[in-house]
């Protein structure tokens, strides 16, 4: 899966071992808004990957850094952003295109508080 394939990239960028949690895909449609939020505690590290869609302009994801500065990042098809989803508020303003396809993968630190949460506590990947 995408989550397993991107684990080494996340580890290389963070210089730390991670444990995969879960992945999901989402399709956003015209006028969609992703409200400002933080992810649940077990989402220590998050990755969002743009799969493209039907739009004239890239739809930025906005994130507040640890000093409360807002940064809005435009991801083109195939681009990814690694971020601390449980720590940093993130959102997307109104989408003006037709559709936007996105994959989200979440990880925890292999030596952290949630190290026993492989696959979000499931016995196998992809099973409830």
Feature names for model-found ranges:
Residues 1-24, 36-38:
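Signature of the catalytic double-stranded beta-helix
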Residues 12-18, 53-56, 96-98:
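Secondary-structure boundary elements
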């Amino acid at each position: 899966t995408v989550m397993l394939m991107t684990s080494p990239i996340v580890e290389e960028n963070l210089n730390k071992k991670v444990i995969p949690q879960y992945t999901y895909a989402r399709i956003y449609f015209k006028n969609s808004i992703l409200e400002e939020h933080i992810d649940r505690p077990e989402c220590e590290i998050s990755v969002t990957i743009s799969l493209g869609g039907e739009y004239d302009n890239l739809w930025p994801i906005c994130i507040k850094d640890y000093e409360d500065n807002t940064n809005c990042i435009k991801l083109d098809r195939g681009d990814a952003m690694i971020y601390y989803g449980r720590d940093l508020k993130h959102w997307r303003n109104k989408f003006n295109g037709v559709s936007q396809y996105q994959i989200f993968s979440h990880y925890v630190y292999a030596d952290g508080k949630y190290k026993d949460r492989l696959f979000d506590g499931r016995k196998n990947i992809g099973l409830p």
